[in-house]
C-alpha cells in the first residue's frame, strides 16, 4: 500500500508519500497510474515513485528476492540518468511507462507479449528490469508529436499522442490492439499473436482526433474530439458496448460523432466492463 512493509490491511485512508524539501520548494503528486498490483506516481518535480509487487520488474528498480518487502514502500525510479524529468506515467497489469521532458517514452516490467514496446527477440526480453526506451515513439521519430497518455491491459498497451494518434503493442489474440489481421506490424513477428513494437492504429474517421484511450484486460476504448466513442477487442461479457459480439479486431463506433443524442466525454475500461461519461447534445 505504500506506507508500511508489515501491515496487511488498512481500513482508513492514510498519508502515503511524504515529499519534504527546503522551505518554499513544494512538491506534490501530479498523477497516479495503477497496475494489477503496483502503483506508479508522478510528482510536480518530474520524479517517479513506484511501490507494490515487483516480481515482474514492474517497479522499474531492483528489489532483491530475499527483500521483496522493500518494494512495498515508495522509492524513486530513474529514467536513464537522474537529469531526466518525467511528464507522464502509465501502467498495465504488470508493466509500467513514463514519458520524459525530452519526449522519449520509457517502458519496463513484464514483456512476454511485447507489451512494453521495447522489442522482443528472444525469451531474454520477456522481462525488462529497468526503464528502457520504447521503440518508434520519441519526439523525433514522431516528427515533433509526443506521447501524452499511456494505458495498458493484461498484456497490451495503448499510446496516445498530442495530435490524436494512437499506437498499440503487445498481445493481439483477442483483437485488443485494434490492428487488422493483414496489418504490416504482424509481418516477420517472432510470434503472430503479439506485436513487440508500437504500431499505428487506424480509426473510421481519421479527421476526428482521439483525445483519450483506456484499456481493459483484453479490450480497449477511445474517445474523439468530436464526441465519438470507439471500442475493440474481446467482448464476451458485453464490455465493448456493441451488443452480443465476442471479438472486434479494429475500432468500431459505439457512439457516433454526427447524429444521435449523446456526446462521449470520457471512457474507462475495467476487467470485463466499461464505463462511459456522456453529455446530451
What are these regions (language model features)?
Residues 1-113, 123, 164:
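Fungal eukaryote-biased detector of long internal structured cores
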Residues 7-13, 66-73, 123-130, 183-195, ...:
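A detector of repeated loop/turn-to-beta-strand junctions in beta-rich toroidal repeat architectures
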Residues 22-27, 81-85, 140-145, 204-208, ...:
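Short glycine-/Asp-/Thr-/Trp-enriched loop segments that recur within the blades
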Residues 30, 37, 75, 87, ...:
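Structural signature of WD-repeat beta-propeller blades
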Residues 38-41, 50, 95-98, 107, ...:
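Conserved core positions of repeat-based scaffolds
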Residues 160-163, 171-174, 196, 202-238:
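Loop/turn-rich, solvent-exposed surfaces of beta-rich toroidal or solenoidal domains
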Residues 245-281:
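Blade-level signature of beta-propeller repeat domains, shared across WD40, Kelch, NHL, RCC1
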Amino acid at each position: 500500500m505504500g506506507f508500511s512493509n508489515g501491515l496487511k490491511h488498512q481500513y482508513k485512508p492514510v498519508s502515503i508519500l511524504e515529499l519534504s524539501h527546503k522551505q518554499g520548494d513544494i512538491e506534490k503528486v501530479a498523477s497516479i497510474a495503477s497496475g494489477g498490483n503496483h502503483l506508479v506516481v508522478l510528482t510536480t518535480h518530474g520524479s517517479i515513485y513506484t511501490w507494490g509487487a515487483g516480481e515482474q520488474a514492474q517497479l522499474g528498480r531492483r528489489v532483491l528476492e530475499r527483500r521483496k518487502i522493500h518494494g512495498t514502500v515508495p522509492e524513486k525510479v530513474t529514467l536513464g540518468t537522474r537529469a531526466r524529468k518525467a511528464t507522464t506515467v502509465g501502467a498495465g497489469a504488470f508493466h509500467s511507462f513514463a514519458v520524459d521532458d525530452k519526449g522519449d517514452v520509457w517502458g519496463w516490467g513484464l514483456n512476454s507479449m511485447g507489451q512494453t514496446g521495447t522489442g522482443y527477440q528472444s525469451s531474454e526480453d520477456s522481462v525488462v528490469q529497468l526503464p528502457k526506451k520504447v521503440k518508434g515513439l520519441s519526439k523525433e521519430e514522431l516528427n515533433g508529436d509526443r506521447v501524452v497518455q499511456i494505458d495498458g491491459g493484461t498484456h497490451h498497451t495503448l499510446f496516445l499522442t498530442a495530435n490524436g494518434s494512437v499506437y498499440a503493442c503487445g498481445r493481439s489474440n483477442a483483437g485488443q490492439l485494434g490492428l487488422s489481421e493483414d496489418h504490416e506490424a504482424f509481418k516477420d513477428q517472432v510470434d503472430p499473436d503479439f506485436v513487440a513494437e508500437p504500431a499505428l492504429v487506424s480509426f473510421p474517421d481519421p479527421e476526428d482526433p482521439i483525445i483519450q484511450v483506456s484499456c481493459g484486460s483484453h479490450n480497449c476504448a477511445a474517445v474523439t474530439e468530436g464526441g465519438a466513442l470507439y471500442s475493440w477487442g474481446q467482448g464476451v461479457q458485453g464490455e465493448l458496448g456493441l451488443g452480443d459480439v465476442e471479438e472486434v479486431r479494429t475500432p468500431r463506433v459505439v457512439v457516433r460523432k454526427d447524429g444521435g443524442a449523446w456526446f462521449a466525454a470520457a471512457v474507462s475500461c475495467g476487467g470485463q466492463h466499461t464505463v462511459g461519461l456522456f453529455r446530451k447534445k
